[in-house]
């Protein structure tokens, strides 16, 4: 008998090693009909594969991300088959499913463009209608090599040659198209009905600029037209909201070839940064933090002791001072530890919550840089909490309460993932278990739903990752709460207990925004540049109808500035319509229009970005309402 264990803990017995598809059918007719793929002992597995005795098995349908991944993987093969029909002689490299679709890398004399997409999509639809079965074949290494050599598919030959000798080599055949692939795939091409080719880009073979440049066609696929239409809408909206474009339009920041990946913040961008830091400093005060600042450059000895030299060296920048090796800090933690150790701490000092807006530098490949989302230097709103083991759970709960406030003020919902021990980690199993359990107990006590993200913890400890959801429904990993019992061991971080003896402290790393730069990029796209009044770089724009109203406009601005309202006067000698359109492009929360009538009555005419024309008001009344809106941080 062969026994498998299902997700709900129940066991199912079979007389022989039936396929996963047959196993699903035996469990229930509904599952047999709807299952598309399975996980066997955590590995995504094709339903054609046989069950394994003692394995943990979980099935997935089109309602699951794993089901969509499988559809897109098959769609990449359908696209490749269509291209083979239309452009004979194309050599195929790799064609994986990715987060929002799939792609295929091609070597062809034909230069692909979007003009080819209609013909390719038409051929794909034809292949889908034929509902061609996908047949999985496992071949001996030599036979697989010879097959692709005979077909002239050089890249497939190289891929096989790179595989370990003991690796199982599988091919998927669909009609006249056969591809080297580990799977998983749909049963047939019939489900690949809703798709769209998106763009063409260049991609070096194996990502190495020394190799040949291939052509990469990006595409996407969904189970329904509604899902595809929604994806295309979000994508189009995201292009309008691109923080790189809006950053330039709103004069917030810039990048220069003299420093790729190193952002330059302009005066208006600095207002955004400072307002975000001011808000977190208020939270520091509310939740009992002190603030420090530590150096940007520290000795190699420190990074050897911390473990960063062994585990993070490829992401660091280095220099020499007085013939000694130094590194520009990629993380703030060792500096925080040195601060803690400047005095002998007592249990009465704990928990000690130490915050820092620390500038860190991490090396990123030039091709990976992406506006404020992927940079080489950024500010982390880091904090390190030093505590006893008994305080771990309560401190994690307090951090989560802080994040609830932090994200709530921006109208950002979030979900949480518990990221566990990665392969490249340090420390004993016992300490990892204690740390992971502390995070799990805290989040369960707080009643916050969470998912497990296996193997994605930091090298020194497990963590909770907070993924915020923006106005387009996209998620961004921002906050972290990382438990660390490793660095306190390495640095002998201790405190004097009630018994008068030294005890090892526990260290918790937390960052709410994560990267201040990245969070600003997220907010730009979340709000489409139309920031809430309290963080808007310019809160009101005074627009004189004609030049003779300019002095009155300046007096209104001066009065508002006295109440710490950020205000600008539009002094351009242009038409009123032009000046209003310009303020709209700048996405200013309030336009204040002053003409002869307003001068005569000592009033202002107010237009709200949110609520339209608010009519004539007295300046004191408008200022009072605006101050209230700013103070309450209306979103």
Q: Where do the protein language model's features map onto the residues?
A:
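NTP/phosphate- and nucleic-acid-binding module
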Residues: 1-91, 98-635
